[in-house]
Regions:
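Canonical tetratricopeptide repeat
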Residues: 52, 91, 125, 129, ...
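Structural marker of alpha-solenoid helical repeat scaffolds
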Residues: 45-47, 76-80, 115-119, 153, ...
Length: 244
């Protein structure tokens, strides 16, 4: 359920790109459908093409390479005093998370949020990603603060509510966990990860019937995905239950 902050750029129809910004935007557009080709185009743009190179590398699952490219784009944008710098830092953080480097992700997301230019959903997604990095590095209290902010700015994102519910359960706050997983279910009941966590929370609260029902749904929705397999494993505890 990893999601990159989109670069909202499009080439004007029928008009060949001429300015550096137009060339970058055209490259980013190409990267969404032809990442390998866009990577080659990005190299011809030099420093101005780092953001496109990041999108292109992410599209080829080279997340560490993408993070490095987005970091370069962010630094270049800062030097040029461009408003996109914070967006690039946020994308670098997201890519570092995908690459499995939570410490570098946190540093990039710190820079993104410190800029003060992210707003609304983009800011919420940055708080969400930083919370993920904080959980990965063991700072649960700071993650709680960021998830509270994420669920305000990115309230329509079920992942924000899912992670908030999961963290609440891990911290022993079951009332909060129940409230937040209900919000996630409202937005994405067909997500096996959401159903899995709903079962985990119900089990922690001693609600075996609810846990069993949620885990069964998770296993049905995605039997071959990690969430579905985890749900199937959780259901084995009911194997001897005649009510199963």
């Amino acid at each position: 359920m990893i999601q990159f902050l989109a670069l909202l750029a499009a080439q004007a129809a029928g008009t060949p790109p001429t300015s550096p910004t137009q060339k970058l935007d055209a490259c980013v557009t190409q990267a969404r459908t032809d990442p390998a080709g866009a990577e080659q185009v990005a190299r011809t743009l030099g420093r101005a093409g780092e953001a496109c190179r990041g999108v292109a590398l992410a599209g080829q699952d080279d997340f560490a390479g993408a993070a490095t490219a987005f970091t370069a784009a962010a630094r270049n944008a800062e030097l040029a005093k461009e408003a996109r710098a914070a967006d690039y830092w946020a994308q670098a953080g997201n890519a570092w998370l995908a690459a499995g480097d939570a410490a570098k992700a946190r540093a990039a997301l710190d820079a993104a949020l410190a800029a003060g230019t992210l707003t609304d959903l983009n800011r919420g997604e940055a708080y969400l990603d930083r919370a993920r990095a904080l959980v990965a590095t063991g700072d649960m209290k700071a993650a709680r603060v960021d998830l509270d902010l994420a669920t305000k700015d990115a309230a329509d994102d079920p992942l924000a509510w899912l992670l908030s519910a999961t963290l609440a359960r891990r911290m022993g706050d079951l009332p909060r966990a129940k409230l937040d997983i209900a919000q996630a279910l409202r937005r994405s009941a067909d997500d096996a990860s959401v159903q899995l966590e709903a079962g985990n929370i119900a089990a922690a609260a001693g609600e075996a019937d609810r846990a069993q029902a949620a885990w069964k749904e998770a296993a049905r929705l995605a039997p071959d995905a990690p969430a579905g397999r985890s749900a199937t494993n959780a259901l084995t505890q009911f194997a001897g239950d005649p009510k199963k």
